[in-house]
């Protein structure tokens, strides 16, 4: 069964992945490498090579970049564009045939899903700006719209930015208090940040 998408835009928030696509036995004949990758994913043994074999629309390579598979159950995690799909998006989280990348596996294995998430069938709306396009997502859970706001501490990159901002604020406060001697002053932020790179 073909699962032709209406859109092939990277990171689209697609409503569902109700098209099951070919059965696993059919997939084994047509796409043996992808079939093997999905089986390894079911056993939490997927590799970076498997991630490449499965791919995504955003990657523009692999099984899930192909129109006939992009909407299939196998691609519900990699093509959903949803925040924490492996934790809270039912077509990904609740489907053993949905390929989960090594990153998804690590989040699940290390129990890094944010607390209080509800398993939802689809995404009603999402928004944000710049590189933080996943600032919020409205999940449709049993006809009730739940807005999920990102906890900054769940994003290591955002946490690092927050720490740097705090250091800059502390520096500004201390330097504006006006030390009497040059040796009392903190080094400039550029020197602080260059030292961070040495860790």
From Swiss-Prot:
Any one biological process term the GO annotation gives: symbiont-mediated activation of host autophagy
Cysteine-cysteine disulfides: none
Protein localization: Virion membrane; Host membrane
Swiss-Prot/TrEMBL keywords: Activation of host autophagy by virus, Disulfide bond, Glycoprotein, Host membrane, Host-virus interaction, Late protein, Membrane, Transmembrane, Transmembrane helix, Virion
Induction: Expressed in the late phase of the viral replicative cycle.
Function comment: Essential for viral fusion with host endosomal membrane and core release. Not required for virus morphogenesis and egress. Induces complete autophagy through the interaction with and down-regulation of host PYCR2.
Subunit structure: Interacts with host PYCR2; this interaction results in autophagy activation.
Protein name as it appears in the record: Inner membrane protein E199L
């Amino acid at each position: 069964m073909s699962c032709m998408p209406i859109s092939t835009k990277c990171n689209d928030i697609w409503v569902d992945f109700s098209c099951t696509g070919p059965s696993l036995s059919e997939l084994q004949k047509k796409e043996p490498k992808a079939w093997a990758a999905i089986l390894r994913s079911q056993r939490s043994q997927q590799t970076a090579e498997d991630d490449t074999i499965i791919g995504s629309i955003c990657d523009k390579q692999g099984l899930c970049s192909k129109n006939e598979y992009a909407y299939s159950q196998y691609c519900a995690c990699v093509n959903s564009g949803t925040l924490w799909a492996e934790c809270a998006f039912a077509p990904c989280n609740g489907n053993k045939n949905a390929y989960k990348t090594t990153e998804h596996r690590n989040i699940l294995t290390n129990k890094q899903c944010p607390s209080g998430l509800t398993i939802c069938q689809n995404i009603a709306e999402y928004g944000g700006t710049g590189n933080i396009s996943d600032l919020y997502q409205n999940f449709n859970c049993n006809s009730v719209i739940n807005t999920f706001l990102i906890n900054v501490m769940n994003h290591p990159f955002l946490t690092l930015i927050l720490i740097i901002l705090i250091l800059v604020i502390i520096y500004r406060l201390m330097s504006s208090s006006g030390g009497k001697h040059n040796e009392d002053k903190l080094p400039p932020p550029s020197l602080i940040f260059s030292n961070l790179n040495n860790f």
